[in-house]
Amino acid sequence: MAVPENLTREQCLYLAKLAEQAERYEEMVKFMDRLVAVSASSELTVEERNLLSVAYKNVIGSLRAAWRIVSSIEQKEEGRKNEEHVVLVKDYRSKVESELSDVCAGILKILDQYLIPSAAAGESKVFYLKMKGDYYRYLAEFKVGNERKEAAEDTMLAYKAAQDIALAELAPTHPIRLGLALNYSVFYYEILNASEKACSMAKQAFEEAIAELDTLGEESYKDSTLIMQLLRDNLTLWTSDMQEQMDEA
């Protein structure tokens, strides 16, 4: 579906919400892209920012899930030495990867051109820089060789820039600061294979938030405690994996 040229910001917002209700996330992305373009000179509201994130997260989420399934089937076919199937699966995987690359390129362009330059508040800067790190990390998940190295370096730069602002301007219990720590630590664990660094980062974020839990406002309590639970789940999983590897060694 082509997005009409003459839509206002309010119409884009309404249609994006409509597409979300209908679970048509590719169209939701198009409406939010247009909203960003028509409101280029002003910052997005928190609602608009969250809708943009939800739209892209759903589109990229289904593609990442598809890629994992196809890659796992590819490994099975290689194990069975089924050459004809391997060729077909590889070709199919490269199509999924091409779509993944396009989606990441789309949001990264919007972040660099509009959203990061126009972000005034510390909270929005962290939100968009974290988002930039996330989409470079999704590229690093499937790219190989030099492209993977570059995507990982770009991820690190974005997360580091976000972290510098988050530590200076956001409370340890702030859901955006916690979400950044969660994703940054996952990057260390999954992409850089630096499990000790991943654990120490997640542990520090969790403990700093616990220490200030009584300062949490009603509105962000649910978001913050949910992310803290995810940090703790990862810590439990990672430390047991590290223990198993040590036992095997």
Swiss-Prot record:
It holds the Pfam family 14-3-3. It comes from the Eukaryota. GO terms for cellular component: cytoplasm. Signal peptide: none annotated. InterPro entries: 14-3-3, 14-3-3_CS, 14-3-3_dom_sf, 14-3-3_domain. One of its GO terms (biological process) is signal transduction. Belongs to the 14-3-3 family. This is 14-3-3-like protein D.
